[in-house]
Amino acid sequence: MPHYVVVKSPMRRRRSPRRRSPRVCYSPRRVACSPRRRSPRRRSPRRRSPRRSIVVY
């Protein structure tokens, strides 16, 4: 039987540490970084990504 395991895609792993790092806010608008995290728009793409990350081992 194929075992379905939800694995974080490599793209998410590389982007997540960069977003957490303060270097992401190198732009002159520091406030633009905080509202982006709170925006619900980022939550929708995250829900779609887990479906693609499902890998059959």
Curated annotation (Swiss-Prot):
Q: Where is the composition biased (Basic residues)?
A: 10-22, 35-51
Annotated region Disordered: the residues are: 1-57
Q: Would you tell me the protein name for this molecule?
A: Uncharacterized protein 104L
Q: Where is the composition biased (Low complexity)?
A: 23-34
| Organism, as annotated | Invertebrate iridescent virus 6
Highest taxon listed in the record's lineage? Viruses
